[in-house]
Amino acid sequence: MRSSIAFLSLALLLVAADAQAAVGSRVLVQDDGSLKINGRVVHLFGIYMPKDGRICDNSIRPIRCASRAASALRFRIRSVVYCENVSKNRDGSLNAVCLISSRGQIFEPKTDLAAYLLNEGLAVALPNAPFEYKTIERIARSQGRGFWGFFADSIN
C-alpha cells in the first residue's frame, strides 16, 4: 500500500513537472518542418520530410509559405507540445518524439506528430524508426495518401 502511494505521488510529480515545462514552452513550426522550442531546434525523430512543392497560407499576414509537412504541423499544433529527447545532432539540434493533446489537457491521449505526418503521407520513416512508424508509412503508401498519391494542385 505504502509503495503504491509513493509510486502514485512520484507519477503525479513527474506529470506536473512535465506539464509545467511544456506549458512554459513556446513552439514555432519552422518552414522545414522542424520545431523551435525555447530557442532550440527540434527535429521529429524517426522521419524524413521530403522537400516538396511549397504551399502558401494567404489567410495570415505576412503570407507564409512552407513545405506541405510544415503547413500540416502548423494546422495540427493547437495545444501544448510534449517532446522527449532521443538524441542530439552535431549542430546542437535535438531529435525527439513529440506529442500533442487535442484539447491541451494533461491526462488526455496524445498524438505523435511524426506518426501524424506519416499517416498523412507527408513524411517517410527512416531506417532507425520504430516499427510502428514503418507500418504507418506502408499503410499511407498503400492508400495513396499525400505524396504517395497525387496532389490536385499539380495537375496541368
Placement of each model-derived feature along the sequence:
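Small beta-barrel nucleic-acid-binding modules, primarily SNase/OB-fold domains
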Residues: 18-156
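Positively charged n-region of N-terminal signal peptides that target proteins for export
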Residues: 1-4
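Bacterial N-terminal signal peptides
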Residues: 6-15
